[in-house]
Curated annotation (Swiss-Prot):
InterPro entries: CS_dom (IPR007052), HSP20-like_chaperone (IPR008978), NuDC (IPR032572), NudC_fam (IPR037898), NudC_N_dom (IPR025934). Keywords: Acetylation, Cell cycle, Cell division, Coiled coil, Cytoplasm, Cytoskeleton, Microtubule, Mitosis, Nucleus, Phosphoprotein. The gene is NUDC. It comes from the Eukaryota. Residues 173-331 are annotated as: Interaction with EML4. Disulfide bonds: none annotated. PANTHER family: NUCLEAR MIGRATION PROTEIN NUDC, NUCLEAR MOVEMENT PROTEIN NUDC. Changing S274A: Abolishes phosphorylation by PLK1. This is Nuclear migration protein nudC.
Length: 331
């Protein structure tokens, strides 16, 4: 039978026809067979039973395709569910270890590398400060430092993101990627939590988490809208409630979970921790461009758009050597 493009050839016409059948698929099928009966010799033109055989074969073919599609969809959903459960369990384990007091923690290679980078940056900052006191740095360096301090003035007081690009707060911990957010809320109770003990209400722009009969741990307006039907929550180890939220806008970092939370400095977020591989190619290229432009701006270098303009200008100047651009001003 025909390929996908051939199958979709009459979709517009059939969809318009289907929308005029208030009785649904049954009425649409009846109209189709009525057309075959009245306008063709489908039922009487061939041998006995040929029409019925053709209908049965066609139904069997498309039924197999439909069942295959449904199985593949279920497999994808199950894989996503397992991934979310594993992520929630990992988050709950981290939250539980943090509430159980100081412990020796073995760092992963990535965490160790990031920690070493922070130590090196701190040493560089100390050396820089010492050089400033000794007067060994020239005035342009001092001017750059003052400009950086002025630029970051509005970010003073904001929290530094945790390793998951979220925040570690007194009563809960949250992490995020561009497309989703995970939250772990540990409860200090002397019994194993069950679903009936909890009040978890996920709405498009509001979240509430707490114990029944107790003041809610979280009860506020979310930073932005979430897909309620794709969000979920569960209880880990009988002590920690984990919540998974799917963002509607997958092109932004949240600076807080709910409006009552302190803000994190989204400029210090590490984009590499997010799952760019989960995004479609178009969205991924846009995000990578945003990340590149952000890095360029932080270093005082031209963005990708500015680089393109410079290349076009340079090409034009090369093609017109007779023109004098020395006194020209470019924006």
């Amino acid at each position: 039978m025909g390929g996908e493009q051939e199958e979709e050839r009459f979709d517009g016409m059939l969809l318009a026809m289907a929308q005029q059948h208030e009785g649904g698929v049954q009425e649409l099928v009846n109209t189709f067979f009525s057309f075959l009966r009245r306008k063709t010799d489908f039922f009487i033109g061939g041998e006995e039973g040929m029409a019925e055989k053709l209908i049965t074969q066609t139904f069997s073919h498309h039924n197999q395709l439909a069942q295959k599609t449904r199985r593949e969809k279920r497999a994808r959903q199950e894989a996503e569910r397992r991934e979310k459960a594993e992520r929630a369990a990992r988050l709950a384990k981290e939250a539980k270890s943090e509430t159980s007091g100081p412990q020796i923690k073995e760092l992963t290679d990535e965490e160790a590398e990031r920690l070493q980078l922070e130590i090196d940056q701190k040493k560089d900052a100390e050396n820089h400060e010492a050089q400033l006191k000794n007067g060994s740095l020239d005035s342009p360096g001092k001017q750059d430092t003052e400009e950086d301090e002025e630029e970051d003035e509005k970010d003073k007081g904001k929290l530094k993101p945790n390793l998951g690009n979220g925040a570690d707060l007194p009563n809960y911990r949250w992490t995020q990627t561009l497309s989703e957010l995970d939250l772990a809320v540990p409860f200090c109770v002397n019994f194993r939590l069950k679903g009936k003990d909890m009040v978890v209400d996920i709405q498009r722009r509001h979240l509430r988490v707490g114990l029944k009969g107790q003041p809610a741990i979280i009860d506020g307006e979310l930073y932005n809208e979430v897909k309620v039907e794709e969000s979920s929550w569960l209880i880990e180890d009988g002590k920690v409630v984990t919540v998974h939220l799917e963002k509607i806008n997958k092109m932004e970092w949240w600076s807080r979970l709910v409006s009552s939370d302190p803000e994190i400095n989204t400029k210090k977020i590490n984009p590499e921790n997010s799952k760019l591989s989960d995004l479609d190619s178009e969205t991924r290229s846009m995000v990578e461009k945003m990340m590149y432009d952000q890095r360029q701006k932080s270093m005082g270098l031209p963005t990708s758009d500015e680089q393109k303009k410079q290349e076009i200008l340079k090409k034009f100047m090369d093609q017109h050597p007779e023109m004098d651009f020395s006194k020209a001003k470019f924006n």
